[in-house]
């Protein structure tokens, strides 16, 4: 791993202290400190292939979530009276251009609430919980039954980074470090290992 930052994690109960030492500047020392809540979430990779995944909202955040689910093979349904221009031009996504209604969750594996309307997001959460559907409310981890981590993908290698929603800045910083440490060559390396394993 490239020697740019040194991370220290001190935990006690549900609280954690993260100290990051910046080693990029040789003449001075820079420290950054975050106090965060330890994640209550169980890390898991979910197979969404061919599964209905609903996104409530039509903005750029909703667009990014929709693209991520589509790339993973999900049947993506976006519910919003209006959608951003990027969403309009995206193929492979079904649109329901209406205000949110509970019936739009029929048959869904998961739902993501990505609107700027707190009342709508709350209703989506309650409806999903009532139906036993896992739900994510963007930027509100306290209302989520699952969260979406930052990921680095190198072929079959997938590295996930999450602070449980406590500090997106820390999450981004760590992800960027890992992106540098695990380059594109890891995709070829894992392909080779897979072929070698099949011959064993």
Predicted region positions:
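ADP-ribose/adenylate-binding Rossmann-like module
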Residues: 110-114, 121-147
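Hydrophobic, well-ordered beta-alpha structural blocks that scaffold small-molecule cofactor pockets
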Residues: 35-82, 87-88
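Glycine-rich, highly charged phosphate/nucleotide-binding loops
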Residues: 91-106
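Residue-level detector of alpha-helix initiation sites
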Residues: 59-61, 119, 165
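An accessory alpha-helical subdomain
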Residues: 165-200
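Short, Lys/Arg-enriched N-terminal segments with co-localized hydrophobic residues
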Residues: 17-37
């Amino acid at each position: 791993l490239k020697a740019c930052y040194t991370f220290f994690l001190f935990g006690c109960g549900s609280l954690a202290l993260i100290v990051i030492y910046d080693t990029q500047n040789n003449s001075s020392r820079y420290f950054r400190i975050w106090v965060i809540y330890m994640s209550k979430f169980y890390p898991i990779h979910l197979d969404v292939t061919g599964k209905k995944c609903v996104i409530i909202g039509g903005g750029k955040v909703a667009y990014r979530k929709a693209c991520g689910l589509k790339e993973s093979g999900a049947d993506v349904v976006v519910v919003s009276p209006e959608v951003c221009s990027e969403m309009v031009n995206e193929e492979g996504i079904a649109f329901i251009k209406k205000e949110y209604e509970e019936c739009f969750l029929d048959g869904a594996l998961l739902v993501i609430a990505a609107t700027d309307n707190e009342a709508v997001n709350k209703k989506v959460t309650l409806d999903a919980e009532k139906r036993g559907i896992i739900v994510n409310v963007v930027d509100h981890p306290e209302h989520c039954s699952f969260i979406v981590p930052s990921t680095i993908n190198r072929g079959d290698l997938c590295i996930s980074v999450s602070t449980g929603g406590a500090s997106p800045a820390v999450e981004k910083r760590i992800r960027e470090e890992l992106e540098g440490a695990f380059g594109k060559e890891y995709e070829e390396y894992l392909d080779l290992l897979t072929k070698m394993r099949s011959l064993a």
